[in-house]
Amino acid sequence: MLHVLSLAYHGVTCPMSNSTASSVAVTKAQQRFDHLAWTLNGEAWEKSYKRLFLKSTCHQVVSFVENVCDQTASLVPSITLGGHNVLYPVRCDGDGFDIVVRQPCPDLVQFREEKTRDEGATISYLAQNSAVRVPELFFHTSSSRIGPAMILLFIKSERSMSDALADPGKDPGEIRVLDPEIHEEDLRRLYGKMCRLLIQLFEPTLHTIGSLVEVGNNHSVAGRPITHNMNDMHNDLVDSEDDCRNKYVARYLFHLLAKKGHLSAFGFLEDNWSAQSQSLELSCSMPCGTDSFRLWCDDLRPQNILLDHHDNIVAALDWEFAYSAPTQFSLDPPWWLLLQLPELWPSGIDDWSQVYEARLRTWLLAMEDEKWGEGINFPANLSTYLRESWLSGRFWLDYATRKSWAFDTIFRKYPE
């Protein structure tokens, strides 16, 4: 079985426990949309969507490959449309290898030029400066006759990490959820492979916040961070005067805490202001706030990790929303242990937290099994940081910081 470099849709929808609950949760999420903007975007995307599959478009893609690779090429079925990108499989006749031309979808993805430039630089940086396995990047450009594009080597794989973790009883059309019957040994083994990947990603340090830019063979943090949240920006429409007031106050208080530097210390040994700090014995010091940042990817999740027939990772895909970020983000346990978002869990955040906490124990055991790289110089084991992040609520703070769609739900639930 071969997997092309593809994405599952990961906008506001997310995995649900059953199809009915999924429909209800998605409907509630859509009620928060700006319907005028949604309609206009939909109409523009419908026109662009049709153009992606025209013969003339495919000929332009093949011609682009021939010019870059300096050999004849042909399109290979079939074109794959993901959540943010369209992928054209192409065979270079001279060398006989398959590549993929990956382009951000027009009228669906924002900041297409920046996104492609930054993703190309990130893949190149990881290939040169980490042990993370990424697709081989032949070429990338933010502007060409066909628009922003990358040429990547086609990746042969058996399945994705999401396939390995998901409930096999789900219908193909249903959005995936972690298999509730998965054997603990299998879960720990698969989690361990993801732990190793995150440790490899944690090792390189960067000097400031922003996106990587490549000039020649040199990389630097010189662009603004293009986040997933920017692509699906929440405009915070309000339902009533009370709703408007509550949202304003929540954001004002959040801004005030950030201005005082409290958010950086929250959930760490230096935290002397929060309610949690009075009841918990925290042992992990906060990371340095200057000249020590980590590469973070908003879209790093099991769906984008390809495995071979031994379930070894052959490639981590889709680095489009990757940027140098506060190290705190990397010291939280990953949200995707259950393969779905907490704010859209049909039984509510409390139930999500209970199920998540049980799986987090397995994740922490898997993390403790992994060896640290020489580049990680922290006073405590990484698993200790992850554990204290969950216990203190730092997990929720950072999650709400990155996701404006979830901010109000989380702030109301965890105001302390």
Regions found by a protein language model. Give the residues of each.
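Intrinsically disordered, low-complexity intracellular terminal segments
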Residues: 168-182, 200, 212-296, 308-315, ...
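Active-site flanking residues adjacent to catalytic metal/cofactor-binding acidic residues
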Residues: 101, 298, 317
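Juxta-kinase regulatory segment immediately upstream of eukaryotic protein kinase catalytic domains
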Residues: 2-77
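ATP-binding pocket architecture of kinase catalytic cores
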Residues: 75-273, 292-295, 311
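Canonical protein kinase catalytic loop motif
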Residues: 296-302
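A structural signal for well-ordered alpha-helical scaffolds and beta->alpha junctions
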Residues: 58, 62, 116-120, 187, ...
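Alpha-helical structural context
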Residues: 67-68, 129, 413
